[in-house]
Amino acid sequence: MPQKKSRKIRKALVTGGAKGYGLGITQALVQAGYQVWITGRDTKALNRAASKLGATAIQADVTSTADWDRVFAVIDQAPGKFEVLVNNAGAGIHIAPAVEQSDADMDLALAVNLNGALYGCRRAAPRIVMAGGGTIVNISSVCARQAWAGWSTYSAAKAGLEQFAKCLYLEHREQGLRVTSLAPSWGATEFGAAAKLDKQAAAVRKKSIQPAELGKIVADICALPSHLFVQEMVLWPSIQPVEPL
């Protein structure tokens, strides 16, 4: 009787994986067959999401390099090849005119929305190369290319992240690393409330980007043939008025 081939174990990490877009991304990657680790600061939410979706939770702060090292030390101990990093963690911090933001507000906004993802990319890239190839998906924002008053620091962080992604891809293109910037707009997540923005009407929220929808897009990007990659994708809900595009 022929022996069954052992199933290839593909490892993935999703930051901010317990809520909002991260929850949808985690679910989609688990369904696609990945062994998924999720990180975040809310231990209860992490454990709840991990139990529900079949992922592994690690409490960690993306702004801490020590936490990043600890997370990858855990992942490295597990069998399989590390193929996917989704830098999803982010926050609005203090959405207000630049002169009304404190230096601490700006520092934190850049730490959460830019530096944290850079720390992750620096650690994930060599592991993905060693695995023979894979994908980093950075969840950016339409704010990287669309200007709105009050979003200056957040926009600067996301624009910087997108340019970093392009350079990182060029540095490792021949080694099989793909780096995608995925920039969604209005979403049915907790982002608005956390940023202390006006709450979306239920009808608008229903027609905004759903976590499961973004999750499917991320999984599809990761499933592309190895000779193809998505450099960047901008995702708008049609209910959102944008002029000019």
What are these regions (language model features)?
Residues 174-177, 181-182, 201-243:
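C-terminal helical subdomain
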Residues 96-98, 102-110:
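Substrate-binding pocket helix/loop in short-chain dehydrogenase/reductase
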Residues 141:
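Residue(s) in the substrate-gating loop at a strand-loop-helix junction
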Residues 121, 157:
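Active-site helix of classical SDR
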Residues 146, 167-177:
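Active-site-adjacent segment of SDR/Rossmann-fold oxidoreductases
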Residues 18-20:
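Conserved glycine-rich cofactor-binding loop
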Residues 60-71, 103:
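The beta1-alpha1 cofactor-binding region of Rossmann-like NAD(H)/NADP(H)-dependent oxidoreductases
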